[in-house]
A protein has these predicted regions:
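Bacterial carbohydrate/catabolite-sensing allosteric modules
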Residues: 1-61, 70-272
Length: 273
């Protein structure tokens, strides 16, 4: 039986969709056995602890996040490794990545069709998926002749709430605000409510991932860009299966593309008249 070690949390809708696709492939081509080591395991035991576990369990492949550049998993274990992008794309392992710039362009085009002239971005500083979503958004805003504003930080929400509040109040209105993901869009929604800034009349809000729980906690619910994550999970299963069977050599990139903007029943991006 093929054994897959998952260095993935289940807390985000992105991860759950990814795993649904992976599990679907395993059901069609298995049986496979999965074991999840959550993020706190690394905090408690370090990367060497993960490496020890993988060796003792005799894992056939690893999928997830790995931020230690000093340990070469493939050299140590000689098994397929697929990493989720965070700070940067790996040059050593296969990547689960995305068309991040394309996602940013889609957001700008969505707002441009609604006749916005002011465009803002809120995201995480220094992580590839947020940096490139910002860049794609900024490039498209420049192309269409809009005004661009951004706020990017690597600090925790509580550390920047006051600064973000001031930034939101100073933005020219109405403004189209694209956030790097739904969690950050929810933070913006909460901050707007605390400061009596009206969504969507003053700020139209758009997130990424279509995390239904995150989006619907907000009032009004948040519109969001849907990604083909389940398809990506299925593709990971197929490619690592080929590698395990020695049918595919070398590393590969699984690119998750944006597919649509989910607005049904959500009011954070009403049509402008």
């Amino acid at each position: 039986m093929i054994k897959i070690l998952l260095l993935i949390d289940y807390s985000s809708e992105f991860d759950r969709k990814l795993l649904r696709g992976l599990v679907q492939y395993s059901k069609e081509n298995g049986p496979w056995l999965f074991y999840r080591l959550p993020s706190y395991y690394s905090a408690m035991h370090g990367e060497q602890g993960i490496l020890k576990w993988a060796k003792e369990w005799k894992a056939d492949a690893i999928i997830g996040q790995w931020n230690n550049d000093t340990i070469d998993l493939q050299k140590e274990l000689n098994i397929p490794v697929v990493l989720q992008n965070y700070h940067h794309r790996s040059v050593t392992y296969s990547n689960l990545t995305g068309d991040y710039k394309g996602t940013g362009r889609m957001a700008a085009q969505f707002f441009a069709k609604r006749m916005f002239r002011n465009f803002a971005y809120f995201g995480v500083k220094g992580v590839v998926w947020s940096d490139e979503r910002c860049e794609g958004y900024r490039q498209e805003v420049k192309r269409i002749g809009g005004e661009f504003f951004s706020f990017e930080s690597d600090k925790q929400e509580d550390e920047i709430r006051m600064e973000v509040s001031q930034w939101l109040q100073q933005l020219p209105k109405p403004v189209a605000l694209f956030c790097c993901d739904d969690a950050h869009a929810l933070f913006i929604s909460e901050t707007c409510r605390m400061n009596n800034i009206h969504i969507p009349e003053e700020i139209a809000l758009l997130g990424v991932d279509n995390d239904e729980l995150m989006c619907n906690i907000s009032d009004p619910p948040i519109s969001s860009i849907e990604l083909e994550v389940e398809r990506g999970g299925y593709s990971i299963g197929r490619l690592i299966h080929q590698q395990i069977k020695k049918e595919h050599g070398g590393t590969f990139n699984i690119v998750i593309n944006p597919i649509r903007i989910e607005q049904i029943g959500r009011a954070s991006c009403r049509e402008r008249v």
